[in-house]
Structures are given as structure tokens and as C-alpha cells.
Regions:
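Hydrophobic structural segments
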Residues: 2-294
């Protein structure tokens, strides 16, 4: 078949145009990496990124191609396995992956549990990014926002406070039941008179130091302090002594996982606002405790 000069020139022009203007389809896009996602997070937290922080890639390689993202409160092996099964190879966790706040791994180099966990992550090309300090430091605090929403307490929030709420004399037992049911917490513990009318609640999601707790509980208007976890020989004893001395006070200990879980559920929604290339989902960390029947 003969080729005319005109058709030859037309074909040449098409080839040149394709070279100058490559397809804008997915094949022309650079793969989304874990480092890309982390950079987008840094660009959108709305605060300067701290030089000293636990918010780092703690497992895997930053240049790993991301196939899907899972947010979670704690990157336990169970969470990592479920994320891998769902095809989510970037796990964004609020709490540590390696058993200490700093995610220090050296003490566990020869530990069987650590080795099993890291081997699984390597096998499934997984990356874990810790997102703790800046998620709390944002305004609003991502954990506090998610928890208030999950509990249905947005309307009770005190103006200019992310962690204080007002109620109309709700009995302590009723409020404790509400917290247990709405958070799906199995092991909520309560200190105080079940009939105590609660008008003002102060909350600390996660762990709270006694040096901060006692300043809050000492305020006359605060009836109830809600916390994820605390030391029994500090905050718990202090509240018991306040009650024994005639003060109308109460304490609810939810458990660390249940007390921050909804904040990382919200994190998945937040990420979808600027990461659209891959699926994103929240993977709940299982509550570790159970209570034997009496």
C-alpha cells in the first residue's frame, strides 16, 4: 500500500504532538509514595512541623508505593494484618508500633514478637507512619474533635474549650452507660456515687499525668473527670480522697484505645480531603481487655 506525502506528514505531526503533550491519564502520573502522603499531611496540619517529634515513619521505606491507607489508634499486629488483607499498605497510627512512646526498637532486636511483626510488614511491603503530636496540636485537636462527635457531645462543649462539657445534672451512672455504649468500650471503670448529678465534665483522651489532673479536679465546678488511662496510686487515689473528704467528685476511666479511637476514625475522613489516588479507611484497634463474669 502506497503512502502519500500528505499522509506521511500528518502521521509525523501526530507522533510529534504525542511526544510534546504526553497523556494526562493515570499511566503518566508518578506513583503515590508514603513520603508523598506524609508531605501532604505536613502541608495541611496548619502548624509548623516540630523538629523533635514522634511523628515519623517508624517502619518501612518512605519511597514505598502506596496502594491504600489505613488509619488506626494503635498499629498492633492484628491491625497491620487486617490492613494488609484489605490492601492498605500505609498504616497511619496514633500510638506506638513498637511498645514505647519513642518507638525505640533496639531493645527488641532479638525479641520474637518484634521479629514476627517486622517480618510481616516487610513481606507485605508495608509502611507505618506515627501521627500523634501534630494531630493533637492541630486546631481543633483531631482526637478531641473525633471523640466529642462520637459521643454526641458537640452541643455540650464549653466555648473556647475542646475538652470540657456541660450537662444538666445527668446521673453519673447514666453518663457512664452512655460512654460505654457509644464507644463500644468493654471495661469502663467508675469512681464515685452512681447517683451523683453531673453538670460539668473535663476530659482527657488517652493518658493524663497527675500533675495536670489534680489541677482540673480541684476546680469546684468540675464534677467528673473522664480519662483514657491513669495511675491508680495517683489520680484514682486523689479522687477517692476528695470524695472521702466530702467533695462531690467522680472519675471515669475508659481505657486508652477506646478513649482515642474515634479521633483516628475522623483522621481517615480528614485525609480524604487531600489524598484521592488510593482508598482510605479506618481500621479499629481491638480493645485489649475483657472482664470475667462474676
Amino acid at each position: 500500500m502506497s503512502v502519500t506525502r500528505r499522509s506521511f506528514l500528518r502521521a509525523g505531526t501526530a507522533v510529534a504532538g504525542a511526544a510534546l503533550f504526553p497523556s494526562a491519564g493515570p499511566s503518566a502520573q508518578s506513583p503515590l509514595t508514603a513520603a508523598d502522603v506524609v508531605q501532604r499531611i505536613k502541608d495541611r496540619v496548619g502548624i509548623p512541623w516540630r523538629a523533635q517529634t514522634v511523628d515519623n515513619v517508624v517502619a518501612g521505606a518512605p519511597e514505598t508505593r502506596v496502594r491504600g491507607i489505613a488509619t488506626t489508634m494503635m498499629a498492633t499486629l492484628d491491625v497491620i494484618q487486617r490492613a494488609a488483607k484489605a490492601g492498605r499498605n500505609l498504616v497511619i497510627t496514633h500510638e506506638p508500633t513498637f511498645f514505647s512512646h519513642q518507638d525505640t526498637t533496639e531493645p527488641f532486636a532479638q525479641d520474637a514478637a518484634y521479629q514476627f511483626k517486622t517480618a510481616f510488614m516487610r513481606e507485605h511491603d508495608m509502611v507505618v507512619f506515627r501521627f500523634h503530636d501534630h494531630w493533637h496540636a492541630m486546631r481543633p485537636d483531631g482526637i478531641a474533635f473525633g471523640m466529642a462527635r462520637e459521643l454526641g457531645w458537640e452541643k455540650n462543649r464549653v466555648a473556647d474549650s475542646q475538652r470540657e462539657f456541660t450537662f444538666d445534672g445527668v446521673p453519673l451512672s447514666k453518663l457512664a452507660d452512655q460512654i460505654r455504649d457509644r464507644l463500644g468500650a468493654r471495661t469502663v471503670r467508675v469512681v464515685g456515687d452512681p447517683a451523683l448529678p453531673v453538670n460539668r465534665v473535663a476530659a482527657s483522651w488517652g493518658y493524663y499525668t497527675f500533675s495536670a489532673t489534680n489541677l482540673v479536679m480541684a476546680r469546684p465546678e468540675v464534677d467528673l473527670f473522664v480519662v483514657g488511662e491513669t495511675r491508680e496510686w495517683e489520680t484514682v487515689e486523689y479522687v477517692q480522697d476528695m470524695i472521702a473528704s466530702g467533695r462531690k467528685k467522680a472519675l471515669i476511666v475508659i481505657g486508652h484505645v477506646a478513649s482515642e479511637q474515634a479521633g483516628m476514625k475522623y483522621c481517615a475522613e480528614w485525609l480524604k480531603g487531600f489524598v484521592s489516588e488510593v482508598p482510605i479507611e479506618f481500621v479499629a484497634a481491638s480493645e485489649p481487655f475483657w472482664t470475667p463474669r462474676g
